[in-house]
Amino acid sequence: MIIPERMSVYINSLDVGNGAFLDELEQEALRDDVPIIRQDMQSFLKVLLAMHQPKQILEVGTAVGFSALLMAANTEMCHITTIEKYEKRIPVAKENFQKSGMGHRITLLEGDALAIMQELTGTYDMIFMDAAKGQYIHFLPDALRLLRTGGILISDNVLQDGDIIESHYAVERRNRTIYRRMRE
């Protein structure tokens, strides 16, 4: 998130931690270069979860299950549906859900998020998008269709640490297409 440092310090000061299981999972993910949400987003999510107390959450982009487990640990009576395409990470996420003792509150859907979202029915109180940033624009119509009136849509790191506002030529060549799509 790009927020003033004093706000970030304040939000993080409210955070009481994630517990041993999530702390260990976070360290493993960082060690293995698995992208997971940063500390400031973790704290922000916890505040939103406490304020809104969602009962149904859709997560787009499971990775190893860290965010889904964080949301499950910080809600009561909430079910999380999460979507993951990367075959290498799916069994790891499933194992983490089982080990955590919260797996009964999480449904993992395997495959392309766009195709899966088009088939989903019902509504969600919160949708958390943390997948391929360049695909967010394609996810948006279904995300809005699936979001209940008054629900919360969170798209992680859409500003790419501020790089999205840089000149086309100031951005590394490999990131130009992603940033162009995100500007749309």
Task: Show the residue positions of the predicted features.
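A short alpha-helical cap/connector motif
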Residues: 1-126, 133-154, 158-184
